[in-house]
A protein has these predicted regions:
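Conserved acidic residues
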Residues: 109
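Class I (Rossmann-like) S-adenosyl-L-methionine-dependent methyltransferase catalytic domain
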Residues: 1-45, 50-106, 120-135, 140-201
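Short catalytic micro-motifs in class I SAM-dependent methyltransferases
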Residues: 115, 119
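A conserved beta-strand element that flanks and buttresses the S-adenosyl-L-methionine
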Residues: 112
Length: 201
């Protein structure tokens, strides 16, 4: 992640401007955790975990969760939230775009990106995708939220749907669909977010 984006997120957390924090888990995540075709609990990686609401949701339902974020203030709040919820989550300070291949555990069966990768520059995005691929067990599921590409000032640059197969050549795309469950406002209200679900070969 670029220094500018990191500073931007740090400032927003400091000011309490966190529109990505939600009360309920996103519908596609809830389907994977609790739906009729849910995954058996295992190891989960939540990149850009923020204050930990999705990580805590999964941990309450038996998952062994690691949350990764670049903003220390967000991680401090995430740890407090986990303690208050009575669950154990491993929260790590780090940048998925700078993590070396092999630095993360290689046993994750569920990987969640609730809006991290779509803010990365192309070279960072390729590195992050390779790191996630290395961290996933065969059969693992990656759930990714991404805006459509476009210039929105300081907002995330987005991901072209046509890019996804090239970024994740060792994955099969299970579905992509509009993220109608996400309420966007302000400069990103027309960002046309989509959910992508991929399965590791």
């Amino acid at each position: 992640m670029s220094a500018g984006y990191k500073i931007g997120y740090q400032v927003m957390y400091r000011l309490g401007i966190t529109p990505w924090v939600h009360g309920e888990p996103p519908e596609p995540l809830a389907a994977l955790i609790e739906g009729p075709r849910s995954l058996p609990p295992g190891d989960m990686l939540d990149i850009g975990c923020g204050t930990g609401q999705d990580a805590i949701y999964a941990a309450r339902r038996g998952w062994n969760v690691t949350g990764l974020d670049v903003v220390p203030r967000a991680l401090e709040q995430a740890r407090r939230n986990a303690r208050a919820a009575g669950v154990a989550v491993r929260f790590l300070h780090g940048d998925i775009a700078r993590a070396g291949r092999g630095e993360l555990d290689a046993n994750y069966t569920l990987l969640l990106d609730g809006g991290c990768l779509h803010g990365l520059a192309p070279d960072q995005l390729r590195r992050a995708a390779a790191t996630l691929t290395d961290a996933a067990k065969p059969g693992a599921v990656l759930l990714m939220l991404a805006f459509a590409p476009g210039r929105r000032g300081p907002a995330p640059r987005g991901i072209d749907p046509a890019q996804v197969p090239g970024l994740f050549p060792q994955w099969d795309l299970a579905f992509s669909r509009p993220a109608t469950d996400i309420d966007l406002r302000g400069p990103v209200r027309n960002a046309s977010p989509s959910w992508y679900q991929l399965v590791r070969r």
